[in-house]
From Swiss-Prot:
Top-level lineage group: Bacteria
Record-level GO BP terms: iron-sulfur cluster assembly
ATP-binding recorded as keyword: yes
InterPro entries: ATPase_NBD, Heat_shock_70_CS, HscA_NBD, HSP70_C_sf, HSP70_peptide-bd_sf, Hsp_70_fam, ISC_FeS_clus_asmbl_HscA
Protein name, entry field: Chaperone protein HscA homolog
Record key words, sorted: ATP-binding, Chaperone, Nucleotide-binding
Keyword Cell wall biogenesis/degradation: no
Source organism per UniProt: Haemophilus ducreyi (strain 35000HP / ATCC 700724)
One GO molecular-function entry: ATP-dependent protein folding chaperone
Length: 617
């Protein structure tokens, strides 16, 4: 006997149109813009084939420059060349002057106490400066992508407060950008490495840039990143490595720079040397009239105190997060200064695991933001194409006997909605448990449990009288909504699930293969379970009838004969012979036919008792 009545399915299928979206790493020193193109995420390059755009704006009376050309003006016109506006955004003037007393700008407070920077174009707020950088990045993106952007994801430090985040949004909106989301920089880096769809656990993001160091401790649970703690050092970065190396070179050469030009030349040499030592064990040096060399070991010794400072901040962040080092499952490296081999080695030793370094640390945040932007704008991410375009595994529901009734079959295109109707199994039943399952097997024990919920408030009726409509709906993002509704009262309950969460492509494939290799055995098990359900139903009905009317209409011999057949079915039901159970159900049905007729007659007699003939006619 069928437990479900399949209603006419309703199905929708709105095709996706690719929209242009980018991820922006709005950095303190440099900014980057990235996008997903032809299913590949990549950083967009400027006219000089550079990915890094200096976060610098230079103002003249009638124009402004952004990026490299603006940075080139810093030495000649520092008061009109705004560098590191990110440090100022969302802060009060008093806070800015306390934190950064040596900035070369002329400040004035706005009406609400925020800093305004005097330039040749008048006073500029950090929001306006950031807006000019974002406008430049937007123009670059629209040139490279040959179209108008539908939205952007902008990254911010995890420690940014509400004012700093809102100011960043305001800067974007000032130039007409549709901000899909502000994304924490460490989260973006983790997304770039695909950690959002992998294992759950604690992730450390070690971000050593040019001027600052940030450490973030994240917990990934059910695809959601939670920031447990942040820390760092705003006066520690790759620039400090350069200054130490420059001082060492000047000491070795016994030459001190005489002016700003020579100082810049020395720092440039130090930077080039640092980069060279990331590739080689030793490199030659030439400064003024001096020639020498430096080994990687010597360089490591120079920067060791600075690296130790960063690890102290890491230990403090772990303590703040109440996390032991052993709990950290992945370490992500961000920032150009993490290219230094000694930094990678020290971080690896500290966390007792090899850090993730396969993605360019300068680009990793922008790449993660681009992946998120592509998802939020409505496009399909590479690693979820199968899971989002079609239902990868059938979605079903548990029925009596531990069976699975498939409601949305595997490979159904999404979005989709389908419904089936249940009925109650027992007299007076007022609640129904809904068990949502995923998989291709026939039995509940062999499928993946997604969720359970209970529909309450079903009006008490005889078994089979109530109708409960269960609707499964999968939207374009792969989110499954299940709703159960009793049709007469409209009382309902529902739940939302992400069926694709926690399953890799390999696991999906294995589940499909398992269903194929076990198809015959599964079908036999299903048929056996179905016969057991039918047997339970028959036994329950006969027992209730015997208890109510058996002694009134049956002789002892007739009563005993039915009990014998019923006991036989109970014993066979415990076995595995499906055919024998099926035959025993028929035997019990045959043995109770006369009893059913006598019960019918008894009911008629009771209905007619005390009534005159003319009342019946």
């Amino acid at each position: 006997m069928a437990l479900l009545q399949i209603a006419e399915p309703g199905q929708t299928a709105a095709p996706h149109q690719l929209r242009l979206a980018v991820g922006i790493d709005l950095g303190t020193t440099n900014s980057l813009v990235a996008s997903v193109r032809s299913r590949q995420v990549q950083v967009l390059l400027d006219d000089k084939e550079s990915a890094l755009i200096p976060s610098v704006v230079h103002y003249t009376e009638t124009s402004k420059m952004v990026g490299v050309t603006a940075f080139e003006q810093a030495s000649y016109d520092p008061q009109n060349t705004i560098i590191s506006a990110k440090r100022l955004i969302g802060r009060s003037l008093m806070d800015v002057q306390t934190r950064y007393p040596n900035l070369p700008y002329q400040f004035q407070a706005s009406e609400n106490g925020l800093p305004l920077i005097h330039t040749r174009q008048g006073y500029k707020s950090p929001i306006e400066v950031s807006a000019d950088i974002l406008s430049h990045l937007n123009h670059l993106a629209e040139q490279r992508l040959a179209g108008e952007l539908s939205g952007v994801v902008i990254t911010v430090p995890a420690y940014f407060d509400d004012a700093q985040r809102q100011s960043t949004k305001d800067a974007a909106r000032l130039v007409g950008l549709n901000v899909l989301r502000l994304l924490n920089e460490p989260t973006a880096a983790a997304i770039a490495y695909g950690l959002d769809s992998g294992q759950e656990g604690v992730i450390a993001v070690y971000d050593l840039g040019g001027g600052t160091f940030d450490i973030s401790i994240l917990r990934l649970s059910k695809g959601v990143f939670e920031v447990l703690a942040t820390g760092g050092d705003t006066a520690l970065g790759g620039d400090d490595f350069d200054h130490l190396l420059a001082d060492w070179i000047a000491t070795q050469a016994a030459v001190q720079p005489k002016n700003a030009t020579e100082q810049r030349q020395l720092l440039t040499l130090a930077t080039q040397t640092k980069i060279a030592l990331s590739q080689a064990d030793e490199t030659p040096l030439h400064f003024a009239n001096w020639t020498g060399n430096i080994t990687q070991a010597q360089f490591n010794q120079l920067i060791q105190p600075l690296v130790k400072r960063s690890l102290v901040a890491c230990r403090r962040a772990l303590k703040d997060a109440s996390v032991d080092i052993e709990e950290v499952c992945q370490v992500v490296m961000v920032g150009g200064s993490t290219r230094v081999p000694f930094v990678r080695e020290a971080v690896g030793e500290f966390f007792a695991k090899k850090p993730l370094t396969s993605i360019d640390p300068d680009k990793v945040v922008a790449l993660g933001a681009a992946i998120q932007a592509d998802i939020l704008v409505g496009n399909k991410p590479d690693n979820e194409m199968l899971l989002l375009d079609v239902v990868p595994l059938s979605l079903g529901i548990e029925t009596m006997g531990g069976l699975v009734e498939k409601i949305i079959p595997r490979n159904t295109t999404i979005p989709v909605a389908r419904a089936q109707e249940f009925t109650t199994a027992k007299d007076g039943q007022t609640a129904m448990s809904v068990h949502v399952l995923q998989g291709e097997r026939e039995l509940v024990d062999d499928c993946r449990s997604l969720a359970r919920f209970t529909l309450r408030g079903i009006p008490p009726m005889v078994a089979g009288a109530a109708t409960i409509r269960v609707t499964y709906q999968v939207d374009a993002d792969g989110l499954l909504s299940v709703t159960a509704m009793e049709k007469s009262t409209k009382v309902q309950a529902s739940i939302q699930i992400k069926p694709s969460y926690g399953l890799t492509d390999e696991e999906v494939t294995q589940m499909i293969k398992s269903s194929m290799s076990n198809a015959k055995a599964d079908m036999e098990a299903r048929q056996l379970a179905e016969q057991r359900v039918e047997a339970d139903r028959a036994i329950e009905m006969v027992m209730a009838a015997l208890q109510k009317d058996g002694k009134a209409v049956l002789s002892v011999a007739e009563f005993n004969a039915i009990e014998v057949e019923m006991q036989k079915l109970i014993e066979l039901k415990a076995g595995t012979d499906r055919i024998a159970i099926q035959q025993s159900i028929k035997d019990l049905d045959l043995a109770t036919q006369a009893f059913a007729a006598k019960r019918m007659n008894l009911s008629i007699q009771k209905a007619l008792a005390g009534k005159a003939v003319d009342e019946i006619i």
